Amino acid sequence: KKNIILAGALTLMAAAISACAPAGSNSNKKGLEAYQNGDYQNAVYLFKQAITQEPSEDAYYCNLGQAYCAQGYYEEAIESFTQALQLGGSSFYSYRGMGLAYNGLEEYEKAIESFQQAIEAAGSLDSSCRLDVVGYRAEAKMKLGDYEGSLEDYNELIEAGYRLRDIYQLTGNVYLLMDDVDQALHCYQECLDIDNRNYEGYLTMADALKKAEAEEARKVVLNAALEVIPYEAKDWCYRGRIYLELEQTDEAFSAFEESYNKGYAQAGYYLGYCYELQGKSEEAINLYQEQIKHDPQDAGLYNQLSSCLVRQGEYQDALIMIQKGMQLADESQMADFLWNESICYEKMGNYDTAIEKLMSYLEQYPADKDAKKELAFLYSR
C-alpha cells in the first residue's frame, strides 16, 4: 500500500501522515510533504500528477480527497474518495474522508453514514483509528441535533479512556446544547482536573457558556483560570485574555505588557488591542509599526495594523498594509485580509470594486453567511 493521509482525531487535532506505509511515487511523496506544510493547492497538483503516473493506485485518490477537504472543496473531495473506493482499496480512510467532506457540506446524515462505514471497515487497524471516527460521528450527531446519540458516542470514548481532556470538554458542549449547565460544568471540571493549565480550554469553555447565555457559569470558569499561577511569558498572555473576557481592561493590559516584556511577541497583538479599547489608537498603531520593524515577515502584524486602520477610517493606509500582508499570509490568514480589503473599498464608496473583492472572497470561503449578506447589501447600494 502507498502512503495515505490520515486526518486527525476530532476537531481539535491536526492532520497527520501514516507512518507505517511504504513510500509511494515521487509525486505522491512530494504531495505528502506539501500537505504537511499546509500547501494544499500544491498538494492537489502533486497528487493529480501521481494519479497520472499510476491511475490505478487508490491511495493517491484518497490523498487527493484529503487535500481537497483541507481547501474546503468538499464535492471534489467526495469524488476523489469515491474513486478510491471504486478501485477497491483505502476503504477506512476513504469513508472517513467522505464523512469529513459531508460534514463540511453540512450534510450530517450522510456524514454519519460514512463514519459508520469507516468504523465497520476499521478491521485490524489500531483502535485509535476507529475511536477517531467515533469522535467525528459524535460531532456530526451533535450538529444534526441528535444530542443523545452524540453523548452515547462521547461516553464510549470516555469509557475507552480516549483523549479524555478533549472528550470531556466536547461532552460538556453537548450538555450546554441540551440546556444542562450543571452537567456541562461537571464535564468541564473533569477536563480541567486532567490539565488545569489548559488555558485554551478555559477560553473555549467560556465561549461556549457565553453562547449558551450561562453568564454565571462562564464567570466561574474564567475565575478558575485566574487561580492558575502564570510561570512563562505565554501564560501571562493567556491571563490577559482571561481578563479581557471579564472586561477587566486595566488588568488585561498589565498582563499583556508583562508577557510582551518577557519576550512573547504575540502579546503585542493584544497589547495594541488594549490601547484601542482605551481610546489610544495612535499608541496601538505605533506599537504595530514598531513590531513590524522587528519582524517584517509576520503577516499577523499587518493584519492587526490594517484592522486598526480600518476601524480608524484610514482606508487608503489600511489597503497598503493589506496588500503587504497578503504577500506574506498563509491560507489561514487570507480570509481577514480579503474581508478587510472589500470593506475598505465599500467605505471609500467604490462599490463595484468592493463587490468584485467580496465575490473573490466568497469563491474561497463559500460558506461565509455574513459575506453573502454583505454582498446582497452592496448590490442594493
Language model features with spans:
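Start-of-helix register in tetratricopeptide repeats
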Residues: 25-26, 59, 93, 128, ...
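Canonical tetratricopeptide repeat
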Residues: 29, 63-66, 70, 97, ...
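Residue-level recognition of tetratricopeptide repeat
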Residues: 32, 66, 100, 139, ...
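Register position in tetratricopeptide repeats
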Residues: 36-37, 70, 104, 143, ...
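Short coil turns that delineate tetratricopeptide repeat
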Residues: 55, 89, 123, 162, ...
